[in-house]
């Protein structure tokens, strides 16, 4: 039987909230303010969740972790990814690989890129690449008002799964 191969895309954007811890890529960055949100505000983890859910045909992050679901209030991006991964494996699906790009001025990702890739790959049991870019001062990320992330994921399962 041939494997079923699916690709998903996810995005997330949050405003920055002064004084809030900055969780990004499942890492705590002490040198920047974090993002507002129902959870920890980790836009990279959220974009990855959306990409995985999309590829798996399991809806989206709002469906699974919606603000109307109090049990997910304050949840970490790492725990969200673990939950999505668990949902997928229960359906016979696995992550082939994933990529996430953070869009914003701060925090600087480069010095912790390898660490982020190790953490994310460990959670998902597959290679995860991390990149970052700025918007050259344009838009809410360029003005430092928020952070955004875009992610892709390749999901593999038995034929007919997902």
Curated annotation (Swiss-Prot):
4-CDP-2-C-methyl-D-erythritol 2-phosphate binds at residues 12-14, 38-39, 60-62, 133-136, 143. Pathway: Isoprenoid biosynthesis; isopentenyl diphosphate biosynthesis via DXP pathway; isopentenyl diphosphate from 1-deoxy-D-xylulose 5-phosphate: step 4/6. Binds 1 divalent metal cation per subunit. Its cofactor is a divalent metal cation. It is an enzyme of class 4 (lyase). Its EC number is 4.6.1.12. One of its GO terms (molecular function) is metal ion binding. The record marks 38, 134 as: Transition state stabilizer. Keywords: Isoprene biosynthesis, Lyase, Metal-binding. It catalyses: 4-CDP-2-C-methyl-D-erythritol 2-phosphate = 2-C-methyl-D-erythritol 2,4-cyclic diphosphate + CMP. It holds the Pfam family YgbB. Gene3D superfamilies: 2-C-methyl-D-erythritol 2,4-cyclodiphosphate synthase. GO terms for biological process: isopentenyl diphosphate biosynthetic process, methylerythritol 4-phosphate pathway; terpenoid biosynthetic process. A divalent metal cation binds at residues 12, 14, 46. Homotrimer. Belongs to the IspF family. Involved in the biosynthesis of isopentenyl diphosphate (IPP) and dimethylallyl diphosphate (DMAPP), two major building blocks of isoprenoid compounds. Catalyzes the conversion of 4-diphosphocytidyl-2-C-methyl-D-erythritol 2-phosphate (CDP-ME2P) to 2-C-methyl-D-erythritol 2,4-cyclodiphosphate (ME-CPP) with a corresponding release of cytidine 5-monophosphate (CMP). HAMAP family: IspF. This is 2-C-methyl-D-erythritol 2,4-cyclodiphosphate synthase.
């Amino acid at each position: 039987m041939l494997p079923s191969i699916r690709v998903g895309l996810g995005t997330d954007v949050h405003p920055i909230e002064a004084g809030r811890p900055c969780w990004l890529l499942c890492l705590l960055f002490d040198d920047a303010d974090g993002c507002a949100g129902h959870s920890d505000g980790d836009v990279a983890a959220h974009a990855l969740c959306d990409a995985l859910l999309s590829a798996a045909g399991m809806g989206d992050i709002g469906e699974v972790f919606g603000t109307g679901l109090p049990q997910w209030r304050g949840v970490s991006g790492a725990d969200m990814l673990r939950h999505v991964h668990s949902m997928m494996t229960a359906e016979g699906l696995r992550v082939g690989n994933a990529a996430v790009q953070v869009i914003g001025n701060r925090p600087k990702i480069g010095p912790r890129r390898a660490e982020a890739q190790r953490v994310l790959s460990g959670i998902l049991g597959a290679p995860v690449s991390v990149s970052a870019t700025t918007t050259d001062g344009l838009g809410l990320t360029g003005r430092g008002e928020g952070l955004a992330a875009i992610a892709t994921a390749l999901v593999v399962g038995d034929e007919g799964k997902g």
